[in-house]
Regions:
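Single conserved hydrophobic/aromatic residue that forms the stacking wall/gate
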Residues: 1-13
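Structural and coupling elements of P-loop NTPases
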Residues: 12-549
Length: 549
C-alpha cells in the first residue's frame, strides 16, 4: 500500500475503489515564496495537520538540533535551507496531497522552475510586512506560463504588517493577477486579533500562545459579526474598522469566479500566521476544495486525460546520491494518467527501450518506502540506472506517447571550472555531467573544446557552493572556480545554423560563443546592450531565454 512514515495511508488495504475515485482525491501543488516568507513553516503545518509529522521544528541552521522535514542534503542541514526541491505526500480530510516544496532561500536553482512543471496549482506565500519580492516574481512567471491556479497566503500577520489593501494592490499591479480576499485580517502585529471569514460570515479570534507553535492545536474563538461580545473581544476601534472594511469589500462588486481561479487569472487570498498555526487549517480546507484534481497534460499531437486507462508519466527531477552509502540516483516522475503498479513494464520513449520499474518509492525527506501502486497526480521516485533525462516520457508499452519537453531556463551566473588534479579528469567529467543531468547546473563549452575546463551556469549563486561541495564530497575532486563577467545567455533558435554561420555573426568583442551538452549553440552576453547589438546587426537572428529539452 502507498503510504508515508507517520501518516495515514493514502490507499487502503480494503477493496479498492475505481481509479477515477483515487485520482479525483489527488491534489498536487507547489509552494512558492521569497526567502523567509514562512514557506517551510507553512509546509510543516500542513504535514502536522495531515499527521505526517508529530511536531513542527523550526529550522535555524546549526543552532537547532531539529531540521525541517523537507531538508535532507548535508549542505541543507548545515545551513538550514532547502537547496533541492522535496516531495511530500500525506492524507487530509479524504484528500491525498502531494506537496512539491521548493527552495525558499536567496539563491534558488533551475530545479525550482522545473518543479512547477509537475504541479497542478501553486500556493504563493507572501510576508505581510514585505509584500511581493524578487523571487516571488520569478516563480510567479513560470506559474503564469502554465496557466495553473495560484492561491495566496499572506503570512506573519502577528508581526508588523503593511495595509492589506496595499498588499492586494501590489499583487495585482506587480504580478498582473486579480485578487479576491477570502478572509480579512483584524489588526496586525501585537494588535492582531484574528480574521473575518467572508464565506462563513464569522470572526475567528486569534489568542496568542507561547508554546503552541509546534503543535496542531490553536487557541481561537468564533464570533458572528453582529455578536454583542465581539467589540469587547477585539476592541471597539478594531471592531469599527472591521465593519467598515467588510462593507467596503462587499460593496466593491468583485465576484468570486472559480473559472478565473482555475485558469490562473484570479488568486484567492488568505491572511494568517503559519508560525502560530492561526488560519492554517481553514486555509488548507478551503484550498483543497477550490484547487483542481490532476489536470490534463499536453503531449505531441494530443491531450492526455488523467482518467485515461493507460499509464503515463514524465521525469521532472533527477537526484543523485540521496543515500551516500549506496551512490544511488533517483528520478522523480509525475504520473499524468492511469494507475502505476509495482513491477509494471513501461516504455522509456526517449531511450527507445522497455523497462521494469521494480522499486518505486514514496519519499519524505530521507525516509523512503517501496510502494505497490500510485495514481495520476502522484509523484514517485524510481531508480535511475543513468538513462533518464529531465522531461523524458514513460508510458504503457506500445503507446509512443511523448509529453512536451520541460524548458531549460537561462542561467544568470557563470563560472569557469577545472579540476585541480589533472589525474582526476575522469571523476571530474563524471561528476560534472551527473550533476548537470540532474538539472542542478548547466554546462557549456567553448566551440571545439574538450572537458578540461567547462563553463558552469546557475540560476542562483548558492548552486556554485553546492556544486563544489558535491564534487569534493561525492566525487573526491577538488575544483578551481573563476567567476565570469557574464549576466545573460541565449540559445540561438535559427534552424540549420552551422559553425561557419556562427563565426560570421557580428557581435561585441566581449560576447562569447558556446555550446551546451546537446551541441546547441548559445551566446554569452555581459549586458543587455550586447544582446541588442547582436539582434540589430544580424538580421533574422533568433535568441531565446529557454530551450526545450
Amino acid at each position: 500500500p502507498l503510504r508515508l512514515v507517520g501518516s495515514e495511508m493514502c490507499i487502503r488495504d480494503s477493496i479498492m475503489p475505481d481509479n477515477r475515485a483515487e485520482i479525483e482525491k489527488r491534489r498536487t501543488f507547489a509552494i512558492i515564496s521569497h526567502p523567509d516568507a514562512g514557506k517551510t513553516t507553512l509546509t510543516e503545518k500542513f504535514l502536522l495537520y495531515g499527521g505526517a509529522i508529530a511536531l513542527a521544528g523550526m529550522v535555524k541552521g546549526k543552532r537547532n538540533s531539529r531540521h525541517a522535514v523537507s531538508d535532507w542534503m548535508e549542505i541543507e542541514k548545515q545551513r538550514g535551507i532547502s537547496v533541492t526541491s522535496s516531495v511530500m505526500q500525506f492524507q487530509y480530510d479524504g484528500f491525498c496531497i502531494n506537496i512539491l516544496d521548493t527552495p525558499g532561500h536567496q539563491d534558488f536553482s533551475e530545479d525550482t522552475y522545473r518543479t512547477l512543471m509537475a504541479a497542478d496549482s501553486a500556493v504563493m506565500v507572501i510576508d505581510a510586512g514585505k509584500g511581493v519580492e524578487a523571487q516571488t516574481r520569478k516563480l510567479f512567471k513560470v506559474c503564469v506560463l502554465r496557466d495553473i491556479p495560484i492561491f495566496t497566503f499572506i503570512n506573519k500577520m502577528d508581526r508588523d504588517s503593511r495595509s492589506p489593501y496595499d498588499l492586494l494592490d501590489e499583487i495585482e499591479k506587480e504580478l498582473g493577477i486579480g485578487t479576491y480576499p477570502m478572509n480579512w485580517p483584524i489588526g496586525s502585529g501585537v494588535d492582531f486579533k484574528g480574521v473575518y471569514d467572508r464565506e462563513k460570515d464569522k470572526v475567528l479570534r486569534f489568542i496568542p500562545e507561547e508554546s503552541g507553535a509546534g503543535r496542531r492545536e490553536v487557541q481561537e474563538q468564533d464570533f458572528s459579526l453582529d455578536d454583542p461580545a465581539l467589540p469587547g473581544a477585539i476592541g471597539e476601534y478594531l471592531y469599527d474598522a472591521l465593519k467598515d472594511d467588510v462593507e467596503l469589500l462587499d460593496g466593491a462588486g468583485y465576484e468570486f469566479d472559480l473559472e478565473r481561479v482555475r485558469h490562473g487569472k484570479l488568486s484567492p487570498v488568505f491572511f494568517g500566521s503559519a508560525l502560530t498555526n492561526f488560519g492554517v487549517e481553514p486555509f488548507l480546507e478551503q484550498f483543497l476544495k477550490l484547487t483542481p484534481p490532476p489536470l490534463s497534460r499536453q503531449a505531441e499531437g494530443r491531450t492526455v486525460d488523467p482518467f485515461a486507462e493507460d499509464f503515463s508519466a514524465f521525469v521532472f527531477k533527477i537526484q543523485a546520491n540521496m543515500n551516500k552509502a549506496h551512490r544511488d540516483r533517483i528520478a522523480f516522475i509525475r504520473i499524468c494518467s492511469g494507475k502505476f503498479e509495482k513491477g509494471m513494464e513501461v516504455e522509456h520513449v526517449q531511450g527507445g527501450r522497455r523497462m521494469k520499474l521494480s522499486q518505486p518509492q514514496q519519499l519524505m525527506a530521507q525516509s523512503r518506502e517501496i510502494i505497490d501502486e500510485a495514481y495520476a497526480g502522484d509523484i514517485i521516485g524510481v531508480f535511475d540506472p543513468g538513462v533518464f533525462s529531465i522531461g523524458d516520457t514513460l508510458c504503457a508499452p506500445g503507446k509512443k506517447l511523448k509529453f512536451q519537453g520541460i524548458p531549460t531556463f537561462a542561467p544568470e551566473l557563470f563560472s569557469l571550472v577545472r579540476q585541480k588534479d589533472t589525474m582526476k579528469r575522469k571523476q571530474f567529467v563524471k561528476g560534472a555531467n551527473q550533476i548537470a543531468q540532474e538539472g542542478a547546473i548547466q554546462i557549456f563549452q567553448e566551440i571545439n573544446s574538450g572537458m578540461e575546463e567547462i563553463i558552469v551556469g546557475v540560476v542562483g549563486s548558492l548552486q556554485f557552493d553546492v556544486f563544489q561541495y558535491r564534487m569534493e564530497n561525492e566525487y573526491n575532486v577538488e575544483v578551481h572556480m573563476q567567476t565570469l563577467p557574464y549576466s545573460f545567455i541565449r540559445w540561438i533558435d535559427n534552424e540549420g545554423l552551422d559553425e561557419a554561420a556562427l563565426r560570421k555573426l557580428n557581435l561585441t568583442s566581449d560576447t562569447k560563443k558556446v555550446q551546451d551538452l546537446k551541441g546547441r549553440y548559445l551566446l554569452l552576453f555581459s549586458n543587455q546592450w550586447s544582446i541588442n547589438w547582436a539582434l540589430e546587426r544580424n538580421e533574422g537572428l533568433l535568441l531565446s531565454e529557454f530551450s526545450e529539452n
